[in-house]
Amino acid sequence: MKGKKIILALSIVSIIGIFTGCGPNQGSKDSEKSAGTDNTTVRVGFFPNITHSQALVGREQNTFQKALGDNHKIEWKQFNAGSSEIEAFLAGALDIGYIGPGPAINGYTKSKGDIQIIAGATDAGAILVSRKDLPIKDVKALDGKKVAVPQFGNTQDLSLRYLLTQNGLKDKTKGGTVEIVQADNPDIKTLLDKKQIDAALVPEPWGSRLVKEVGANVVLDYDKVWREGKYPTAVIIVRKEFLQKHADIVENFLKAHVDLTDYINKNSNEASDVVNKQITDLTKKSLSKDILDSAFKRLTVTNNPEKDATIEMVNLSVTTGFLKQAPDTKDLVNLDLLNKVLKEKGQKEIQ
């Protein structure tokens, strides 16, 4: 009889376990997850460029790692082209990334909405220049000229094609008279110096470098290229799956990003030195003080991804043929966590 009572008691315990949905260790695992003690490696993409200033300063000062705590590890992955970074996202090799809005839009489209923009990083910071011996004064004078951009479909390329359209011009592939070529920024400098291209639309610090190192003329400054400079040059993207599983990690990452944006804007000289140190460490080449100062004057370090401009870029991508059709942009920009962070810090939320 005593044995039957023991068996009955064990059966009741088992039944309770089934109905509560817990095995012997399930409760402790759930409490660990809710307490944020699971170890997660967060793979973050970035460029060694001043347009990714928050990433560079954050790397140098360990800001993101401190924000995420000891239970998680930041793993930085360096890229030099947005297309390569998007490929890594599509392969599931990245979780969060600093990137240009053009590639971000492409990633959102190719992933069928799995890649989302969750914050801005920098605005503007691109200029249109011509080689020193050409008296190009405006966009109309690009008629019959060869113009370089860093990459087809990126922010500078879309901006250039917009400018051409606004001035009654088209590129040669569309039956127009302007030849658009793509080349890496260092190669654009060489091509301009050797008179193998006539003009270029490039991001900082390359705009300042072309002016100071090969005597390029500024045709349009940063605030004349598009929307008076109120357009994104770099944004933060995340895999939706990662965001859903690790919203707390993404929120803490954004807290660090917002703090870094404030720090850079309030301590521009000190921050530019930190950025330059990171660029030197990563590329083995430093920027001169005058180029760095000139470049930063053309940039706006911000948390705002300029949603309206980003949506307009989608339309430009369709118009120029980089996207076959416009995707549903409803989930392209997700500012819920960013606005939560901004509200907690007493800062204005972004619409």
What does each model-found stretch correspond to?
Residues 1-41, 345-351:
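Short, low-complexity disordered leader/linker segments with a strong preference
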Residues 32-181, 198-201, 219:
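Short, glycine-/small- and polar/acidic-enriched structural segments
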Residues 62-72, 223-228, 296-306:
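Short, solvent-exposed loop/beta-turn-alpha elements that line the ligand-binding surface or hinge
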Residues 111, 174-177, 181, 186-278:
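Pocket-lining segment of extracytoplasmic ligand-binding domains
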Residues 52, 56, 61, 86, ...:
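Extracytoplasmic/secreted envelope proteins and their assembly/folding machinery
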Residues 315-351:
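Conserved C-terminal helix/tail region of periplasmic/extracytoplasmic solute-binding proteins
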